[in-house]
UniProtKB/Swiss-Prot annotation:
SUPFAM superfamilies: ALDH-like
Activity regulation description: Strongly inhibited by Ag(+) and Hg(+), and comnpletely inhibited by p-chloromercuribenzoic acid.
Keyword hit for Transcription regulation: no
SUBUNIT field: Homotrimer.
Phylogenetic lineage: Bacteria, Pseudomonadati, Pseudomonadota, Gammaproteobacteria, Pseudomonadales
Protein name per its UniProtKB record: 2-aminomuconic 6-semialdehyde dehydrogenase
Organism of provenance: Pseudomonas sp
EC number(s) given by UniProt: 1.2.1.32
Length: 491
């Protein structure tokens, strides 16, 4: 049986307390995971500070660029190991893990290496009345030891999205992956060891949230900043702990994202895009659309076409190359999603597709599978329409005017993303800017330029990451002002 240990101060550390890593494909045990206690988290934080006081704290930006590229190269060399671990932990199809999760996880290190290598220096010249002048420039410095708490839906991608810029800025990190997906984080620690990164720069601690590693990190007085992706409720708990220490936080939380489909859209292109927006990763992407607004003239056509597409969607073994949807992350999460299927029935929804659990007649029946599901007929104040479900389910409803759909789409406590489908260029710009979200896609979905800002409004998060926005979060700027006299004093 595989053992996933903690990695602290450059050493692999076992724990007296362990838990099981279970695959959602068939409910079998993948590995035994060693849970970090408070003392081990404290040791990780101290190791991070020692690294900052030693060799790592003296690295230049150019040296850190080289480190990030070496990490990416070693990850690429072990790409198959990362694929196997990611698919075992999550059950996501090979078609997704091999084209999105693992390549993007590697690309995050290369991308932030490139950004750091070309990052502009904020500098200004101020001319003074006596003929002298002042030169001001911003010196970028690390925050210190950053607590990184990452989610289970895109485990490697979102972990490296945080770790790469944190290291680029010269920080040390204490990483806690989700208890549901410890595999690729452990492999990343192996990569750090293989490339020889100084002890204490990258520390990995396994565990849960309350009364475990997540809480120990968020409450630690010597953690300099916290970055978290996950549920809004957990984010609120972490924020309260961070507020007591007055430390920076970056949160990417939940979403109840809207798709707005106008009658003038390219219908087939829209259908292709919406199948991804609804069911990629079994709907377990914070950017997935759970509320779909369709202009009335094409509403019936859309419902029929979507139901037909779902019938053809292949829900099968993740390692099959043509599988399009796998299981949910866990039996616990499957039960949550199924409870919303039942709530939809109680609230009077019409099921256009799905609504149950697929039966395979083999060991997969012990896994965490649900059917891709589409419902209709609910009011905008129904709980199923307002609460984040985070599964392969959406509610479709018609609308009659642009102003109506903007109002309805914005009627939510969340504000992460929206996708808009129209061939009217003016409408595309107009509606996109009126959506109260962090990102609006037009005639596409999940198309990401890693240099651009990413984050949400309302309950969907605090702050922006991506490109220079990430470097600005993970560093402090000191303005250096130097007066240059007009003449040398010895002239």
């Amino acid at each position: 049986m595989k053992q996933y240990r903690n990695f602290v101060d450059g050493k692999w550390v076992e724990s007296s307390k362990t838990f099981q890593d279970v695959t959602p494909i068939d409910g079998s045990v993948v590995a035994v995971v060693h849970e970090a206690d408070r003392d081990l988290v404290d040791a990780a934080v101290k190791a991070g500070h020692r690294a900052l006081e030693g060799e790592w704290g003296r690295t230049t930006a150019a040296q850190r660029v080289d480190w990030l590229r070496r990490i990416a190269n070693e990850m690429e060399r072990r790409q198959q190991d990362f694929l196997d671990a990611e698919m075992a932990d999550t059950g996501k199809p090979l078609s997704m893990a091999a084209t999105i999760d693992i390549p993007r996880g590697i690309a995050n290190f290369r991308n932030f290496a490139d950004i750091l290598a070309t990052a502009p220096v904020d500098s200004h010249r101020l001319d003074l009345p006596d003929g002298a002048y002042a030169l001001n420039y911003a010196a970028r410095k690390p925050l210190g030891v950053v607590g990184v708490i990452s989610p289970w839906n895109l485990p490697l991608l979102l972990l490296t999205w945080k770790v790469a810029p944190a290291l680029a800025c010269g920080n040390a990190v204490v990483v806690k992956p989700s208890e549901d997906t410890p595999g690729t984080a452990t492999l990343l620690a192996e990569v750090m060891e293989a490339v020889g990164i100084p002890p204490g720069v990258f520390n990995l601690v396994h565990g849960f949230g309350p009364n475990s590693a997540g809480e120990f990190i968020s409450q630690h007085p010597d953690i300099s900043a916290i970055t978290f992706t996950g549920e809004s409720k957990t984010g609120s708990t972490i924020m309260r702990a961070a507020a007591e220490g007055v430390k920076p936080v970056s949160f990417e939380l939940g979403g109840k994202n809207a798709a707005v489909i106008f009658a003038d859209c390219d219908f087939e292109k829209m259908l292709d895009g919406m199948m991804r927006a609804l069911f990629l990763n079994s709907g377990q992407v914070c950017l997935c659309s759970e509320r779909v607004y369709v202009e009335r003239p094409i509403f019936d056509r859309f419902c029929v076409a979507l139901a037909e597409r779902i019938k053809a969607l292949k829900v099968d073994w993740p390692h099959e190359t043509d599988t399009q949807m796998g299981p949910l992350i866990s039996s616990k999460h499957r039960d949550k999603v199924l409870s919303y299927f039942e709530l939809a029935r109680q609230e009077g929804a019409t099921f256009l597709a799905g609504g149950g659990v697929p039966r395979f007649g083999d060991e997969r029946d012990n896994g965490a599978w649900v059917e891709p599901t589409v419902i209709a007929g609910l009011s905008d104040d129904a709980r199923v329409v307002r609460e984040e479900i985070f599964g392969p389910i959406c509610h479709v409803t018609p609308f009659d005017s642009e102003s109506e759909v903007i109002r309805r789409a914005n009627d939510t406590r969340y504000g992460l993303a929206a996708t808009i489908w129209t061939t009217n260029l003016s409408r595309a710009h107009r509606v996109s800017e009126l959506m109260r979200v962090g990102i609006s896609w037009v005639n596409t979905w999940f198309l990401r330029d890693l240099r651009t800002p990413f984050g949400g409004a309302g309950l969907s998060g605090i702050g922006r990451e991506g490109g220079m926005h990430s470097l600005n979060f993970y560093s402090e700027l000191t303005n250096v002002c130097v007066r240059i006299d007009k003449e040398s004093p010895d002239v």
